[in-house]
From Swiss-Prot:
Superkingdom as given in the UniProt entry: Eukaryota
InterPro entries: ChyE-like, Class_I_gatase-like, GATASE
Reactions catalysed, as given in the entry: an S-[(1E)-1-(hydroxyimino)-omega-(methylsulfanyl)alkyl]-L-glutathione + H2O = an S-[(1E)-1-(hydroxyimino)-omega-(methylsulfanyl)alkyl]-L-cysteinylglycine + L-glutamate; (E)-1-(glutathione-S-yl)-2-(1H-indol-3-yl)acetohydroximate + H2O = (E)-1-(glycyl-L-cystein-S-yl)-2-(1H-indol-3-yl)acetohydroximate + L-glutamate; 2-(glutathion-S-yl)-2-(1H-indol-3-yl)acetonitrile + H2O = 2-(glycyl-L-cystein-S-yl)-2-(1H-indol-3-yl)acetonitrile + L-glutamate; (Z)-1-(glutathione-S-yl)-2-phenylacetohydroximate + H2O = (Z)-1-(glycyl-L-cystein-S-yl)-2-phenylacetohydroximate + L-glutamate
GO biological process: glucosinolate metabolic process; proteolysis
Identification of the protein by name: Gamma-glutamyl peptidase 3
Gene: GGP3
Annotated pathway: Secondary metabolite biosynthesis
Annotated catalytic residues: 103 (nucleophile), 196, 198
Species: Arabidopsis thaliana (Mouse-ear cress)
Subcellular location: Cytoplasm, Cytosol
PANTHER family to which the protein is assigned, alphabetical: GAMMA-GLUTAMYL PEPTIDASE 3, GLUTAMINE AMIDOTRANSFERASE YLR126C-RELATED
Enzyme Commission number(s) of this protein: 3.4.19.16
Function field: Involved in glucosinolate biosynthesis. Hydrolyzes the gamma-glutamyl peptide bond of several glutathione (GSH) conjugates to produce Cys-Gly conjugates related to glucosinolates. The gamma-Glu-Cys-Gly-GSH conjugates are the sulfur-donating molecule in glucosinolate biosynthesis. Can use the GSH conjugate of the camalexin intermediate IAN (GS-IAN) as substrate. Required for the biosynthesis of camalexin, a pathogen-inducible phytoalexin with antibacterial and antifungal properties.
UniProt family annotation: Belongs to the peptidase C26 family.
Gene Ontology CC, one term: cytosol
Amino acid sequence: MVVIEQKKRFALFLATCDSEFVKKTYGGYFNVFVSTFGEEGEQWDLFRVIDGQFPDENDLDKYDGFVISGSPHDAFGDADWIVKLCEVCQKLDHMKKKVLGICFGHQIITRVKGGKIGRALKGADMGLRSITIAKDNEKLRGYFGDVEVPASLAIIKCHQDEVLELPESATLLASSEVCNVEMFSIGDHFFCIQGHPEYNKEILFEIVDRVLNMKLMEQEFADKAKSTMETAQPDRILWQKLCKNFLKG
């Protein structure tokens, strides 16, 4: 008997629009995410949730995992697509489907599970940051696999909102000087990160320049954000390992 192994299938819920730079350089954020978290032989489907595109409810079970991207919108907002996204996440929670929440996605899952989100207490955070990883966490040891769990990890941050109170069912996995909740998990199916494991230096710098040109940021703040990456880089390889092992483990 010939057994044909089913392709693993994942969905990206894109909660932001592609900038002209990202379209020109990468062909869109979808490609940024797939190149970061995807592997050969997998199927990745794009749903522009910001435009109201969602999978049919009956198709949710076909997916092995989901990724919710960052967004310029507030996760505590009441736009139709945000409310719909929360409803879909509630279904995924009930189904125990794996969901990786990034930035806005991290906050959406907090909202869905009864935590509190709002404006960042210490103000917007943009640039490379070192976050402190929780010690002796068995789940993290599993996700890092053959690599020892590091004491800290560098990640690119770009947010003005944050998790103010964790859901009761959540386990805190990382924090920093500027943000109390940098990473958490719920059960084995929700894994959430405030930073952007998919970002690189050029993506960050383009966002900084664009926001600066829109007069939504002071020059001093922009310079400070860029200066964080003068001599350091994010731990992209370790973040990839962590996220892939969660999604596919």
